[in-house]
């Protein structure tokens, strides 16, 4: 299929309407078969559960053109499983995992003309989401739901290449103990908006959220997990029940152990340790890894020696290996790559 006439090299990270999206409705205790539709609008009641009480969750994933010309997506089964966890926590009906993966493949195949070519630096971003659709005026779960998937071509999340970020230790909390920090609920992201706008006004790229209970342990940012590297090349990632289980982080841990032979620790990371790390990065679907050059803790600057001007050496190896796997340049572990076309 001929590609759309898009300036792939200068594509921003924003929404571009594509031709098809998947829609399935839940009513009377069951999901319908679902359809691909050209209609990009959502029509719901003014009193819909999602509008009144934020009953919604979502996922984020990408499709790529590999070096050998295939269109693939990366570990969609893990997105399906994570969305199931989100639905259960928000009292929403689970969209079956096998149907989730199949619907993702349908949407990507139907929008093949929008999948950026190999080497362009651009990808097709895929957004599955679900919301309560029927009128709800009392505080309770909705009875009817809609599950949708749209796709949009996006350029690199970090425009102009990989530039180390300056982040601050944040006084706001992202998640509460026994709350919803471990799921991909829309409400979590709404709560982070004030803090990120404030950070940008203060001249910072991102927030480093701490645990709400003691405010001594590193959690994550508003949309990415942390990954640290010690001076003796050990990879360390924060462990907490209120952190979203990042698929990128999980994959980087495997890459570190199995491909690079590095020692990995998943454990509590204390703020007082930050000065001792050699490298720091933010990992997630959008950018894979964004290097952090400086962390500011209430006026105290912590400069990462390997990240002030460019990505640190270990972080760079992790990034190059994982993106190599995603793009088909490096052999992937079994089940990681779902070939669509």
Residue ranges of model-derived segments:
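Short, hydrophobic/aliphatic alpha-helical segments
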Residues: 32-46
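Conserved phosphate/anionic-ligand binding catalytic regions in large, soluble enzymes, centered on
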Residues: 45-61, 286-290
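Extended Lys/Arg-rich, glycine-bearing segments that form polyanion-binding/interaction patches
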Residues: 7, 79, 84, 88-202, ...
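Flexible, glycine/charged-enriched surface loops at secondary-structure junctions
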Residues: 96-98, 114-123, 207-210, 262-270, ...
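Short glycine-rich loop/turn motifs
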Residues: 19-21, 58, 144-146, 164-165, ...
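Short acidic-glycine loop/turn motifs at beta-strand connectors
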Residues: 23-32, 57, 64-69, 76, ...
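Conserved catalytic-core subdomain
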Residues: 1-18, 159, 213-341
